[in-house]
């Protein structure tokens, strides 16, 4: 009897569906500072990667736009000179159905960027290589940690806004 109840409960839950309808580079900038300044010789890069995420509903039902912004700065460890700066804004258009409303926000800012990440990694690798540097292969990004940090930051700011 319990097996039937479990099967019925599973059948009632909506099936989550996610399709990537499109993905594209919205904005891309690469600046080879090292070449512009004529810096040469042996360098040891120190790479700093900053990630920002955003999502918004589109006018079509169940469609969302998810934006991943990367700001990457590579500096020489020895002198601190900037070697290159790469800024990338990458967008995915998703059709999402069956996700409960209270879980949609984390789904958009965790699962969708996770699906786009291999493409971002490839673009960063190609651009850094084509810019005259060894290919920069990004480590995996923990989108769950980024989401939690952003929630904590917003909660910390909320009491400050109420008292002002």
Swiss-Prot record:
Annotated GO MF terms: unfolded protein binding
Cell location: Cytoplasm
Alphabetized UniProt keyword annotations: Chaperone, Cytoplasm, Protein transport, Translocation, Transport
Keyword NAD: no
InterPro entries referenced in this protein's UniProt entry, alphabetically: SecB (IPR003708), SecB-like_sf (IPR035958)
A cellular component term, taken from the record's GO annotations: cytoplasm
Keyword Hydrolase: no
Gene Ontology terms: biological process: protein folding; protein tetramerization; protein transport
Xref: PANTHER family: PROTEIN-EXPORT PROTEIN SECB, PTHR36918
Family: Belongs to the SecB family.
Reported function: One of the proteins required for the normal export of preproteins out of the cell cytoplasm. It is a molecular chaperone that binds to a subset of precursor proteins, maintaining them in a translocation-competent state. It also specifically binds to its receptor SecA.
Assembly mode: Homotetramer, a dimer of dimers. One homotetramer interacts with 1 SecA dimer.
Designated name of the protein: Protein-export protein SecB
Gene that encodes the chain: secB
């Amino acid at each position: 009897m319990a097996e039937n109840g479990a099967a019925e409960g599973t059948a009632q839950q909506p099936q989550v569906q996610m399709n990537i309808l499109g993905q594209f580079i919205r904005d891309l900038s690469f600046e080879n500072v090292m070449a512009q300044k004529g810096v040469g010789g042996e360098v040891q890069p120190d790479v700093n990667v900053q990630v920002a995420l955003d999502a918004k509903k589109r006018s079509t039902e169940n469609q969302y736009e998810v934006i991943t912004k990367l700001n990457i700065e590579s500096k020489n460890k020895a002198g601190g000179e900037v070697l290159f700066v790469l800024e990338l804004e990458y967008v995915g258009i998703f059709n999402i159905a069956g996700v409960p409303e209270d879980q949609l926000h984390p789904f958009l800012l965790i699962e969708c960027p996770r699906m786009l990440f291999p493409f971002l990694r490839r673009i960063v690798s190609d651009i850094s290589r084509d810019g005259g540097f060894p290919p920069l292969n990004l480590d995996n990004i923990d989108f769950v940690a980024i989401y939690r940090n952003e929630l904590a930051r917003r909660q910390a700011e909320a009491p400050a806004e109420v008292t002002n």
